[in-house]
């Protein structure tokens, strides 16, 4: 906002001409006007005009008038809080307040003209000179918004009239009575009056008009605003409805009017904020609507044409920023989609490779197990071959032992049978009687058999000794063979070493040659 840098000192010298309020008044001089900064830009209350005590006062000004001998200029950043007393306001004044409030909300915009800013950057208090006593009075709007409490969106701002507790004095009550009579007689309030009141209280560049109530042209287009007020029932707690109709609009202005700022807005006051009609207003304080219209319309400022250009420039910048933001958001979504797809592909490839590695590890483990089993089988076969070779060497001796064993078994079986037969035939109990000759013959036969056995045993003893000697000789031969094998092993080692030496010597000889 380039217009916000205009110094307040220059704005304080700007004077606006106002016509005399009554021809019969003794003090009809042109009063000095002084403006304060707007609540929408500098964080201070909206401006107001100085006038004589008998002049019509704006219904928006709700601060009580406190006389003071010396007018002090207060800084803009230090708003004053004054004591307020509850006063009653008539229905016409409430309608006027609501209409001004709705016009503020409907004609608000994001850019303001330099003229309006110059008028809003002045001090927040002004001195009013009285015609009778020559005293000065300070007026200040009761509705001041701190900077921290301002809404973020200008289209959602609304003027708070909760502090309208001051009973309007002088000709202001006449204006309220005239507006009430015009509403009762079903006569619509003129556009000049409503527009001038709106400009007197807020002077918003996007919705302000000239002294005749016509909107200034924005790039060659004429905008006509028609404000219609509908008086609701008393039970609606002060609800008022204002609709703005446009006949010739540019595309951007049509979009701005089609937005919530330009459509018809119904606002209501809570029961605690409901205003009460004034009491004790005399008929002599009334004023004709024509004089109110003339006094209010001649103080409306003229707005330059480049305000709309600044507004459109800011709007274009906002549209460009929004478009850039959408492009960046779409690009971010594209990158997120690409990253998600890449992550999905990478995860699938990772799972596939892990599966392949697991299968390879499993096949390698199976091969290792099979190789180990083959090695075990090979060792078992080697042991079996060694055992077979040893048994083949001892098979001849085992066959000879089998023949000898058969002969011994036959002789032992014959001796056992003979002894059995001889013992069973002898009666030895129960008074047995034996034949001595037969017993003698039996004993003799047994002795003969034993002698035969002894002779056979004697024949076998040398054979057994011979076999034992052969076995001992076999052991000696085996031990000798083992010694010879050791010697052969040593000889083979020596031969291999000598062969290596011979090969090295031959290579050296070949190198020397």
Swiss-Prot record:
PANTHER family: AUGMIN FAMILY MEMBER (PTHR31807), QWRF MOTIF-CONTAINING PROTEIN 9 (PTHR31807:SF38). It comes from the Eukaryota. GO terms for cellular component: cytoplasm; nuclear microtubule. This is QWRF motif-containing protein 9. GO terms for biological process: spindle assembly. Residues 1-89, 115-144, 184-293 are annotated as: Disordered. The gene is QWRF9. Residues 1-26, 43-55, 65-78, 202-211, 244-262 have a biased composition (Polar residues). GO terms for molecular function: microtubule binding. Residues 79-89 have a biased composition (Basic and acidic residues). It comes from Arabidopsis thaliana. A motif (QWRF motif) lies at residues 334-337. InterPro entries: QWRF (IPR007573). Belongs to the QWRF family. Pfam families: QWRF. Signal peptide: none annotated.
């Amino acid at each position: 906002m380039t217009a916000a840098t205009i110094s307040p000192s220059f704005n304080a010298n700007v004077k606006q001409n106002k016509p005399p309020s009554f021809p019969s008044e003794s003090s009809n001089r042109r009063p000095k006007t002084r403006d304060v900064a707007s609540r929408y830009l500098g964080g201070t209350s909206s401006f107001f005009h100085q006038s004589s005590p008998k002049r019509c006062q704006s219904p928006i000004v709700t601060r009580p008038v406190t006389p003071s001998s010396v007018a002090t200029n207060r800084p803009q950043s230090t708003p004053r809080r004054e004591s307020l007393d509850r006063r009653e306001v008539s229905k016409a004044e409430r309608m006027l307040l609501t209409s001004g409030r709705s016009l503020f909300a409907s004609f608000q915009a994001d850019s303001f003209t330099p003229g309006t800013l110059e008028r809003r950057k002045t001090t927040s208090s002004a001195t009013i000179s009285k015609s009778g006593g020559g005293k000065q009075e300070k007026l200040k709007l009761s509705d001041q918004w701190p900077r921290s409490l301002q809404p973020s969106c200008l289209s959602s701002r609304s003027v708070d009239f909760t502090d309208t507790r001051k009973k309007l004095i002088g000709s202001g009550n006449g204006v309220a009575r005239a507006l009430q009579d015009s509403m009762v007689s079903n006569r619509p309030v003129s556009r000049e009056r409503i527009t001038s009141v709106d400009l007197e209280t807020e002077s918003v560049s996007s919705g302000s008009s000239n002294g005749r109530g016509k909107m200034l042209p924005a790039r060659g287009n004429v905008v006509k605003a028609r404000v219609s007020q509908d008086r609701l029932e008393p039970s609606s707690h002060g609800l008022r409805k204002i609709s703005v109709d446009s006949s010739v609009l540019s595309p951007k202005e049509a979009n701005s009017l089609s937005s919530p700022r330009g459509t018809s807005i119904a606002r209501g006051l809570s029961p605690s904020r409901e205003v009460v009609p004034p009491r004790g207003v005399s008929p002599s304080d009334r004023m004709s609507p024509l004089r109110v219209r003339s006094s209010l319309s001649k103080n409306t400022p003229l707005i330059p044409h480049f305000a709309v250009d600044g507004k459109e420039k800011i709007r274009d910048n906002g549209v460009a920023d929004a478009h850039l933001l959408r492009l960046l958001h779409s690009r971010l979504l594209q990158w997120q989609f690409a990253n998600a797809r890449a992550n999905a592909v990478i995860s699938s490839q990772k799972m596939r490779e892990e599966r392949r590695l697991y299968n390879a590890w499993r096949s390698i483990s199976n091969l290792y197990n099979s190789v180990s089993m083959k090695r075990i089988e090979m060792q078992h076969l080697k042991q079996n071959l060694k055992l077979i070779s040893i048994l083949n060497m001892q098979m001849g001796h085992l066959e000879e032992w089998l023949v000898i064993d058969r002969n011994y078994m036959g002789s032992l079986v014959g001796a056992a049978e003979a002894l059995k037969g001889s013992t069973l035939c002898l009666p030895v109990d129960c008074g047995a009687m034996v034949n001595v000759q037969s017993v003698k013959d039996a004993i003799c036969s047994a002795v003969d058999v034993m002698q035969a056995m002894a002779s056979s045993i004697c024949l076998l003893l040398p054979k057994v000794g011979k076999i034992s000697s052969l076995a001992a000789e076999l052991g000696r031969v085996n031990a000798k063979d083992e010694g010879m094998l050791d010697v052969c092993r040593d000889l083979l080692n020596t031969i291999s070493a000598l062969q290596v030496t011979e090969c090295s010597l031959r290579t050296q000889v070949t190198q020397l040659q």
